[in-house]
Amino acid sequence: LSAYITALTKSVQWALDLGEFYSPAQIDIAKKVLTEAERRVALLARGEEDWTRKTGLVVRGYYSSIDDSPQPYGLEIPEGFDFSKPAPLYVWLHGRGDKTTDMHFIHQRMTRQGQVAPENAIVVHPFGRHCMGFKSAGEIDVLECVQHVSEHYKIDTRRIALMGFSMGGAGAWHLGAHYADQWVAVGPGAGFAETKEYIKLQTEDYPAEYVQTLWGMYDVPNYVRNLFNLPTIAYSGELDKQIQAAQVMERAYQAEGAKLPHIIGPGM
């Protein structure tokens, strides 16, 4: 079956198996997701589909190369969008949401607009395996999600921007630094950029040396020079503790003789 269907049905099955209903009212969420899956099955049975040219909020899916599982993602496509012309793609990485598992993520993407709404552009919301910080399988899911969108829509590959806030900001930092050739610009908000300072680890509590070495996989200051190849603009709230991520990266930029553009919201 198409991942456009199985991503939906899997999400409800997992919610049942793993106890991801947090109030009786959320039974209605499962019903809405299954109703949409049933509608799509009926369309495919008639040799039809309506999601490739739909505007507004669209939920699609693809099969992961990691484990062949159906993974959902959300799209926001402006009304009156011209599907015949190459368009910019904005990749928005979501923040942490402990209860926003597959089914709840899908329902959000069916019903709730996101944080950015650029004109004449598509916004994609990767799921990224829930709350993995867009690392490991979550990292690959973002890349495969972008690839899937690019295969099914006319995307101007020179104008793919990466953005995110909180945990999504952390994902934007490390995906931006690791894959700087994939993006036209990166906009990380809040989040975290490394391990040791973020968790306030004291020297006496450091783990084994090999664990510290493994931090290097995702500690973004190690890769800061990659970010010199594209516009990278951090943004933070003045009072938000997660301003720490941008401050760490400001120091990393300074160590290389560069300056990080950093927008700070006063009193926020």
Task: Label the model's feature ranges.
Residues 1-5:
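Amphipathic, heptad-repeat alpha-helical segments
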Residues 18-87:
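A domain-start/cap signature at the N-terminus of enzymes
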Residues 79-85, 133-167, 177-183, 226:
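Gly/Ser-rich "nucleophile elbow"/oxyanion-hole loop immediately N-terminal to the catalytic nucleophile
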Residues 85-153:
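Active-site machinery of serine-nucleophile hydrolases
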Residues 97-109, 181-230:
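Mobile cap/lid helix-loop segments that gate and shape the active-site cleft of serine hydrolases
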Residues 162-164, 189, 235:
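Short beta-strand immediately N-terminal to the catalytic nucleophile in serine-hydrolase-like folds
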Residues 171-175:
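Hydrolases whose catalytic domains are alpha/beta-hydrolase-1, hotdog thioesterase
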Residues 235, 239-268:
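C-terminal catalytic histidine-bearing segment of alpha/beta-hydrolase fold enzymes
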